[in-house]
């Protein structure tokens, strides 16, 4: 048995499914998860000592690569001062100022420890601000594992959602309406039917949990206009795409301002950190100023803040996003070319440093289109690439990520491996 297999068997005795987040278990693709021993730059090494090119990067945070020397130094510099205080620090102010500078729609921001905390708190705040209960989300968009958000649409346009997770009470699910992503007509119909009941619309402007699916400008502009007209709070969940698709996130990319924004991943630099923020008049409803309660013992943790602040400083280097975007596009264009040469139906897309791979004839625009991809072929491709030492997301429904350390040599090695993998698929 390999060390990975030994560790997985051992883990399953004390950890449900052997993992602390389901996608890590390889249930979608089959096989044994890789247990990471260490990482550096664009690579990680598993428990058996094998090196992999990493296109997950901790699911997005590692935009400057693993163990960047300046991020490491920033963390080391604060460790000796204490791990956690449960009291304010100057560093919390500094990272808040940096976030507000980079995302102008965020006038005030509250730090939390996870993306789920950020979205859950933003929804509570929107409900407290509006005095309404109904929220609208979109099929295929993932906003963490809070009860209100683990809901998927029924067959009808305006049906109430049914829980997609056991343990979510129907009384909670009934307040969530799920619509089709990028469907402007469905959106207009929903607002026409009950627009004045909607507390908030929460959306991934660039979805990354049904693979990569871009919000269309028409769809996102319609969201902005309808929320403004009906007094609903527009929440952009940029936990994944924030500081990934552009320096100012999706809002800078599309030129659309949200009322509230949820951030995570990059702002922690690999440490547990997230945030939600937005208009000052909405944020004023948070305790201790207002009646919407939200708290967290480790919110603004000094070690996480140090890693996040240094990462936010590094990504502001001149040309950082131009180079990162070009390198990501070089990867996806190259993969598409290799698939064409092998005669394998395949499409790829990228925006900033996020990318999607689809075993389909074209890039999807909705969850329904994503589900038409050839999942069995993706699973085989995943394992062929894994054998080659290239680690893509172990699910056909997840986006991938490139870091500033994925240089030409790394991309070339990936494309050479893909050439062999696509040839094997076509055989």
Swiss-Prot record:
Its domain of life reads Bacteria
Enzymatic reactions: (S)-4-amino-5-oxopentanoate = 5-aminolevulinate
Q: Which PROSITE patterns match?
A: AA_TRANSFER_CLASS_3
Q: What is its EC number?
A: 5.4.3.8
GO CC terms for this protein? cytoplasm
One GO MF term on file is: glutamate-1-semialdehyde 2,1-aminomutase activity
Q: Which Gene3D superfamilies match?
A: Aspartate Aminotransferase, domain 1, Type I PLP-dependent aspartate aminotransferase-like (Major domain)
The entry's localization annotation reads: Cytoplasm
One biological process term from GO is:
protoporphyrinogen IX biosynthetic process
Q: In which pathway does it act?
A: Porphyrin-containing compound metabolism; protoporphyrin-IX biosynthesis; 5-aminolevulinate from L-glutamyl-tRNA(Glu): step 2/2
The N6-(pyridoxal phosphate)lysine modification is found at: 265
Q: What InterPro entries does the entry give?
A: 4pyrrol_synth_GluAld_NH2Trfase (IPR004639), Aminotrans_3 (IPR005814), Aminotrans_3_PPA_site (IPR049704), PyrdxlP-dep_Trfase (IPR015424), PyrdxlP-dep_Trfase_major (IPR015421), PyrdxlP-dep_Trfase_small (IPR015422)
Q: Which UniProt keywords apply?
A: Cytoplasm, Isomerase, Porphyrin biosynthesis, Pyridoxal phosphate
Cofactor(s) the protein needs: pyridoxal 5'-phosphate
To which protein family does this belong? Belongs to the class-III pyridoxal-phosphate-dependent aminotransferase family. HemL subfamily.
Q: Assembly and interactions?
A: Homodimer.
This chain's protein is named Glutamate-1-semialdehyde 2,1-aminomutase
Q: Which organism is it from?
A: Burkholderia cenocepacia (strain ATCC BAA-245 / DSM 16553 / LMG 16656 / NCTC 13227 / J2315 / CF5610) (Burkholderia cepacia (strain J2315))
In the UniProt record, what gene is named as encoding this protein?
Answer: hemL
């Amino acid at each position: 048995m390999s060390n990975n297999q030994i560790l997985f068997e051992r883990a399953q005795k004390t950890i449900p499914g052997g993992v602390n987040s389901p996608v890590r278990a390889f249930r979608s693709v089959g096989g044994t998860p890789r247990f990471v021993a260490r990482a550096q730059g664009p690579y990680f090494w598993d428990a058996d000592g094998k090196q992999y090119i990493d296109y997950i990067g901790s699911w997005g945070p590692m935009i400057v690569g693993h163990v960047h020397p300046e991020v490491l130094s920033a963390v080391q510099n604060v460790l000796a001062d204490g791990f956690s205080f449960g009291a304010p620090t100057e560093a919390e102010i500094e990272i808040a100022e940096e976030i507000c500078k980079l995302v102008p729609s965020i006038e005030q921001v509250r730090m939390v420890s996870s993306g789920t905390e950020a979205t859950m708190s933003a929804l509570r705040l929107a409900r407290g601000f509006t005095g309404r209960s109904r929220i609208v989300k979109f099929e295929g968009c993932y906003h963490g594992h809070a009860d209100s958000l683990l809901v998927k649409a029924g067959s009808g346009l305006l049906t109430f959602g049914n829980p997609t997770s056991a343990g979510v009470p129907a009384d909670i699910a009934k307040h969530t309406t799920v619509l089709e992503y990028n469907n402007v007509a469905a959106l207009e119909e929903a607002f026409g039917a009950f627009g004045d009941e909607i507390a908030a619309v929460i959306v991934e402007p660039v979805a990354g949990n049904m693979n990569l699916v871009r919000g269309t400008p028409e769809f996102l502009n319609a969201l902005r206009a309808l929320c403004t007209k009906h007094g609903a709070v527009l929440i952009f969940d940029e936990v994944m795409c924030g500081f990934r698709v552009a320096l100012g996130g999706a809002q800078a990319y599309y030129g659309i301002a949200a009322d509230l924004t949820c951030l995570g991943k990059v702002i922690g630099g690999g440490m547990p950190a997230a945030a939600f923020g937005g208009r000052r008049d909405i944020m004023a409803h948070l305790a201790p100023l207002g009646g919407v309660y939200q708290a967290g013992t480790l919110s603004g943790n000094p070690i996480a803040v140090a890693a996040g602040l240094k990462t936010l400083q590094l990504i502001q280097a001149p040309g950082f996003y131009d180079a990162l975007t070009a390198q990501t596009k070089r990867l996806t264009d190259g993969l598409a070319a290799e698939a064409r040469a092998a005669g394998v139906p395949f499409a790829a897309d990228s925006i900033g440093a996020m990318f999607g791979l689809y075993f389909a004839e074209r890039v999807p625009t909705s969850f329904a289109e994503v589900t038409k991809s050839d999942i069995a072929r993706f699973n085989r491709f995943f394992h062929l690439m894994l054998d080659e030492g290239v680690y893509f997301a172990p699910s056909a429904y997840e986006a991938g990520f490139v870091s500033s350390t994925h240089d030409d040599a790394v991309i070339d090695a990936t494309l050479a491996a893909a050439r062999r993998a696509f040839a094997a698929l076509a055989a």
